Design a protein with these regions (language model features):
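Positively charged, low-complexity terminal tracts
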Residues: 20-185
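Sec-dependent N-terminal signal peptides
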Residues: 6-16
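Intrinsic disorder/low-complexity segments enriched in polar/small residues
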Residues: 5-6, 24
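N-terminal secretory signal peptides that target proteins for export/translocation
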Residues: 1-3
Length: 185
């Protein structure tokens, strides 16, 4: 009798713990910069260079130097914030240097072609980085809305942009690309 109750209790615990751990499943980052930063047994120097803010999005170039080997990598760091009545959270996503060209092309397409169209159905486009940062736009209720999610697994990391913000974001990405190339020589 006790064994039956024990087994039921144990089975319930195992099932509940699986449900609890499945609630917030964050995707692992595949970013080369994030991977480089996580290196153990190395002394890392991180330098943050401010770029213009776009609406509520904070942009910085991050240059990471392995002091022991002299190797450097850089990325565009993008931060959004979420406020509820009691507290705030910040979410940071990255675009590796190698991703900036494709992202600029994607945003240019959204700005120059997509936002000028009027689809008959709900339409969405999205560019996703190795660090799970998402940029895109969707057409709903007869208008386009651009967005950025610094962490694709949570809507709390979202910032919605006006079409004019897209051009500014493209400029910021081009500045970041030039700065990273210059600082990682």
């Amino acid at each position: 009798m006790y064994m039956k109750h024990f087994l039921i209790l144990l089975l319930s615990f195992v099932l509940m713990s699986n449900v609890a751990f499945a609630q917030d499943s964050k995707e692992e980052s595949k970013s080369k910069t994030v991977e480089f930063m996580a290196g153990c047994g190395s002394l890392m120097k991180k330098e943050f260079y401010d770029l213009p803010k776009v609406k509520g999005v904070v942009n910085q170039v991050l240059i990471i130097t392995n002091v022991l080997t002299g190797k450097k990598v850089g990325c565009l760091s993008v931060e959004t914030s979420y406020y509820n009545g009691r507290s705030s959270d910040s979410y940071i996503g990255t675009l590796d240097y190698e991703e900036l060209d494709a992202c600029v092309k994607s945003l240019t397409y959204i700005k120059d072609e997509l936002l000028l169209s009027t689809p008959d159905v709900y339409t969405e486009v999205e560019y996703k980085t190795l660090d799970n940062l998402k940029l895109g736009a969707f057409y709903s209720k007869s208008r386009w809305t651009a967005f950025i999610y610094t962490k694709g697994y949570t809507s709390r990391s979202a910032e919605f942009l006006d079409s004019s913000n897209i051009a500014t974001f493209i400029e910021v990405m081009n500045q970041a690309k030039s700065m990273i190339a210059d600082k990682t020589k």
